[in-house]
């Protein structure tokens, strides 16, 4: 999450540096992470047997792959024949985890089983809907009309920079849209910006130890990105203005990206001593080639809308004067298409790389957790903030 906004520069002193270390470590604040021990893992194995609802074949394959990775490490079996469908599916799921460490696979297995257990014990739909609606933030607007769930970044005075609560609200909005009668979900921004990424001014209330904060942040980031990987319906970005940081890297997980000709795309990770997230270390080279991906992810090159289109990050660019009218007219037409056909087609397009995306996301979050605790990251962000750059 490389994007930062800051209200004003201040004098730096040792006490401020200590606060800043904590702020960087808490770039994402979430629920306390479980440090999955062998006992936690064994408990999760027993818990799977007690699930009241069948989680479905896709989740079963994910559980199988994580179990094998956690107990045996990277896939070491010969690839089954094409007609051995069951074992081929298992092999693909395990092999997609690549070199994911055993400890991370064990943690992911425990987290997945925990989420399955929680969902099986969830309250009735009516009560849950009322409770979840009350948790929505004014900074994320969620509306549904004409079969479209519109999710809007709504902090125009902060250039739509994302707060901790906004991350949680987006996870919730996607969860709800995945199971209701929505045909597609569309993201956009209020005001001049689409989204300026993460807002460091929200970290001043951070408490607790640095390592714990970084660990919690990695959990929230992983869950946030997984909510995009898991979304089963068409996912569209309507990029009305400049986009920075995670609002850019997430675009590789969208099914369509429509941009105004005044939009720009910027990922200043190295400038902040950080590393890519939202699976961009995988999706960007796949979309635009290694050299162009490196320009963005390593060297922080800012792309215009036309450049982003030429490199495959953007589906189509529209003149600012007609952007809203043209895009929303088209989306309303798309929303009238048979929803199950679109959902099934998306599943066919995405399913073969889904486990790969989970693995990449987990590895990126582990790497970022370490980066947030590094001196290089602390110093880079301090330098960035003190210069008050224009996004």
Curated annotation (Swiss-Prot):
Q: Name one GO cellular component term.
A: peroxisomal matrix
- In the record, N6-succinyllysine modifications are located at 49, 53, 60, 68, 79, 88, 90, 127, 159, 286
Can you give the residue ranges of the ACB domain?
37-122
Processing after translation:
Acetylation of Lys-60 is observed in liver mitochondria from fasted mice but not from fed mice.
**BP terms from Gene Ontology:** fatty acid beta-oxidation; fatty acid catabolic process
What's the short name of a Pfam family annotated to this entry? ECH_1
Tell me the residue numbers annotated for binding substrate: 196-200
Locate the motif Microbody targeting signal: 389-391
**Residues annotated as transit peptide in the record:** 1-36
| Residues recorded as bearing Phosphoserine in the entry | 99, 117
Q: Where does an acyl-CoA bind?
A: 64-68, 90, 109
Checking SUPFAM superfamilies in the record gives: Acyl-CoA binding protein (SSF47027), ClpP/crotonase (SSF52096)
Query: Which Enzyme Commission number(s) are listed?
Result: 5.3.3.8
Give residue numbers for the site Important for catalytic activity. Answer: 277
Q: Which residues carry this modification: N6-acetyllysine?
A: 49, 60, 90
Described by its record, this protein's role is as follows: Able to isomerize both 3-cis and 3-trans double bonds into the 2-trans form in a range of enoyl-CoA species. Has a preference for 3-trans substrates.
- The identity of this protein, by name, is Enoyl-CoA delta isomerase 2
Q: What is the species of this protein?
A: Mus musculus (Mouse)
